[in-house]
């Protein structure tokens, strides 16, 4: 009995590796992408609820940037959109160092072939030709392929006697393609002039961000120009302008609301209402097609 009393106590040795393993197994985990933080009000939003609300914060109304897939889902009648010209390949006309590799990397990352997707679909049963720019692909910059795809879409719209809707989201001309990129401004504008001569409707929907050469060309040529709320829309950057004119610009300068107030756009439309508004516009102009 006394012998057992003074016997050395046995301990179980637990390694740091076992401790970490236990923590991992017993710590609740949240799957990636389930919750999203609003970059305007800071609220934490449930991803599924956000998607059901058109990727708009239900507290502050902040419109999250969305891509081509979301646009197609929210805009068109189910399974009616048919993509055009997705096989056109981006070239490197100036042999810009690293450009080819960058393009391939972005293609794999975004699953997009270029910064614009074009095609035809139905909105409330009415056909329209649509071009959707996506800022995830090199900030939606306009290169030769972007200009070519939009021009081809407009030319097809003329042949098919259909309205054209362009969703803009761009940082401007693509510097890796130099002057050839700038040429797309005139190219697309020329195609839109032909569309206008044919009496066909062109609606431009400005989304965040729409800047640079896109703003200076086809973004501002719409028969009707719509914009999503609180979108950044302008040509040069705000700080560049302030340094040039040596004046402080208003806080809301280059925002959708500022442009509406000064007559640059026709209407600001929340994303949840865009399909309905576009359907009304197409229906109103049906006789001209």
Curated annotation (Swiss-Prot):
Annotated ranges, domain CoA carboxyltransferase N-terminal: 34-289
Biochemical pathway: Lipid metabolism; malonyl-CoA biosynthesis; malonyl-CoA from acetyl-CoA: step 1/1
Keywords for this protein: ATP-binding, Cytoplasm, Fatty acid biosynthesis, Fatty acid metabolism, Lipid biosynthesis, Lipid metabolism, Metal-binding, Nucleotide-binding, Transferase, Zinc, Zinc-finger
Binding site for Zn(2+): 38, 41, 57, 60
Gene Ontology BP terms: fatty acid biosynthetic process; malonyl-CoA biosynthetic process
HAMAP family named in the record: AcetylCoA_CT_beta
Job description of the protein: Component of the acetyl coenzyme A carboxylase (ACC) complex. Biotin carboxylase (BC) catalyzes the carboxylation of biotin on its carrier protein (BCCP) and then the CO(2) group is transferred by the transcarboxylase to acetyl-CoA to form malonyl-CoA.
Official protein name in the record: Acetyl-coenzyme A carboxylase carboxyl transferase subunit beta
Gene from which the chain derives: accD
